[in-house]
Amino acid sequence: MAPADLASEGPKLEDPPAPHLFGKCPSGLIMAKLETLPVRADPGRDPLLAFAPRPSELGPPDPRLTMGSVGSGVTHAQEFPMKSVGTRTGGGGNQGSFPGPRSGGSGANRERPGRYPSEDKVLANSLYLNGELRGSDHTDVCGNVVGSSGGSSSSGGSDKAPPQYREPNHPPKLLTTSGKLDQCSEPLVRPSAFKPVVPKNFHSMQNLCPPQTNGTPEGRQGPAGLKGGLDKSRTMTPAGGSGGGLSDSGRNSLTSLPTYSSSYSQHLAPLSASTSHINRIGTAGYSSGSSGGGSGYQDLGTSDSGRASSKSGSSSSMGRSGHLGSGEGGNGGLPFAACSPPSPSALIQELEERLWEKEQEVAALRRSLEQSEAAVAQVLEERQKAWERELAELRQGCSGKLQQVARRAQRAQQGLQLQVLRLQQDKKQLQEEAAQLIRQREELEDKVAVCQKEQADFLPRMEETKWEVCQKAGEISLLKQQLKDSQADVSQKLSEIVGLRSQLREGRASLREKEEQLLSLRDSFGSKQASLELSEGELPPACLKPALTPVDLVEPQEALASCESDEAKMRRQAGVAAAASLVSVDGEVEAGGEGGTRALRREVGRLQAELAAERRARERQGASFAEERRVWLEEKEKVIEYQKQLQLSYVEMYQRNQQLERRLRERGAAGGSSTPTPQHGEEKKAWTPSRLERIESTEI
């Protein structure tokens, strides 16, 4: 069983007292037995109902005992006086006398301070979680450790479980709280206006004794058993500052109202505080002086509930307890070992008085709480409504802000999603472009490799073509030189042909003149022959003289022959020969008659034949000249055609070389190759002679 589920035990007085506890009582004394009743902790029940007085003991309420309202809305708040322990004056020093009626008497209703002094509150002994009650063992007046529950087995405490582990025999017969707070939808916290105040003096004395285990049964007879029962009832109180204790009655504010506590020990907080030092009364008698023993208990005179600020009341109460202790011993000034403990009847009477005072206090507290319950409920309801309104406003504002934040987050998320989609698309596009560029680079690398191979193949071919071009250029220059020589020869031949043509014209003209002379000579010969025939017929032969001799004819002709050409000379010689033959013929004719005429005719025929042969020779020579001219023209046409073809092939080769060089430069620039390319100026300078040659060849 957990400590929170333990049953709290409250004190109860029953009459008559048990004879086996205290034995015979003197006449006039009413013995009382202290019994603890279990009270179950219930959040729906008022914890203060456990200390409600019996109906027979309740008297008319004292106006001074009414408590002021706790809430700020209730007026006429006043403090109620509390009766401290041991302040009764009735009875004097008689230890067996009882006080008068509890509702009257000046000793029972003394004025007390309105606040609980924190230095006078007694801390109850704490309860061990897994063991017996603390304070179950104590020391007697002789300094010996005595168990409060040991010795006697008549009560059967040795075989019983500790009280904190016992199940309650019957639930407490208490009424529920007022129904004013039951209308709330949620359970409200029952406030309590009092807190336990811990005194300093008795707390320091209480801690002098270390916690010890309870090894003896709790039903032992005598004072030790009584003090053990008191210790058990006292150890059920909360240990310093629990939420279920009672606060100062003067602090009438809602801030001093603690919440419910789940422990069961809060019901006995006022009683345990007032009875916590009873077990030390017998041991404190040795410290009193020889003057009646009143001053011996002055240092231990603490108030039961922390409100005994009057030193005289405490001294009188403790002095009476000391007197009871000294009466048993017979001498208050005896040593501590010789002192006898106080009588049980005095202790019971003192406990009964204190219990009655506590009941009165509880009743006053109950009445004050009932009076202030409406105000507290109203304040709590107002505060609850205000809190609900604030909570609704906060919820509305927070919901609006959350919606705004959600919308912003949604828009931001949508924007981020769009950006992510765009980035993914850009990434895919860039990847495709990168793949395409990689493929293009690979293709270009392959093309560059092929171009490099072609270039490696073209270089020797280009060298060969260059050598061939140089060789062809040399051949062309040689052919041009030969052409120039042939052109010079042809021009010389042409000039000779022109001279020959002029000579032929001159020969033809001279030949016509000779023919004309020959015709004139023939006419003159015929006329002379006719005249001769006439003269011959008239004159005698002896009288006839010879004509001009051939020598006379040849002499004037030799002077002219030096100025004539070969053909003219030939013609002149032929003419001279013909003239000579004519002279001879004439001579023969003259000499011989008709025979000379026939010879002349034969000579003329021969000369005509020679002339025809000469004409045929000239015709053959003209035909040979024409053939030579034709052959020369054909050769010239062939040379020009060859030059044209050579120039065309050279131009085509040049263009092909330029195209190859341009392709090599383009591929070198694309592939990043550093192949040196010839400059344009060098190409122009290298091919300038071919251009001049082409011009010269076209001018021919």
UniProtKB/Swiss-Prot annotation:
One of its GO terms (cellular component) is cytoplasm. This is Leucine zipper putative tumor suppressor 3. Residues 322-333 have a biased composition (Gly residues). It comes from Mus musculus (Mouse). Residues 203-216 have a biased composition (Polar residues). Residues 345-523, 597-666 form a coiled coil. Residues 109-121, 680-700 have a biased composition (Basic and acidic residues). Residues 1-20, 40-121, 133-188, 202-344, 662-700 are annotated as: Disordered. One of its GO terms (biological process) is regulation of dendritic spine morphogenesis. Belongs to the LZTS3 family. The keyword tRNA-binding does not apply. It is found in: Synapse; Postsynaptic density; Cell projection, Dendritic spine; Cell projection, Dendrite. Signal peptide: none annotated. PANTHER family: ZIPPER PUTATIVE TUMOR SUPPRESSOR 2 HOMOLOG-LIKE PROTEIN-RELATED (PTHR19354), ZIPPER PUTATIVE TUMOR SUPPRESSOR 3-RELATED (PTHR19354:SF6). Its main location: other. The keyword Lipoprotein does not apply. May be involved in promoting the maturation of dendritic spines, probably via regulating SIPA1L1 levels at the postsynaptic density of synapses. Residues 248-265, 301-321 have a biased composition (Low complexity). Pfam families: Fez1. The modification Phosphoserine is found at residues 343, 345. Keywords: Cell projection, Coiled coil, Cytoplasm, Cytoskeleton, Phosphoprotein, Synapse. Interacts (via C-terminus) with SHANK3 (via PDZ domain). Interacts (via coiled coil) with SIPA1L1. Can form homooligomers.
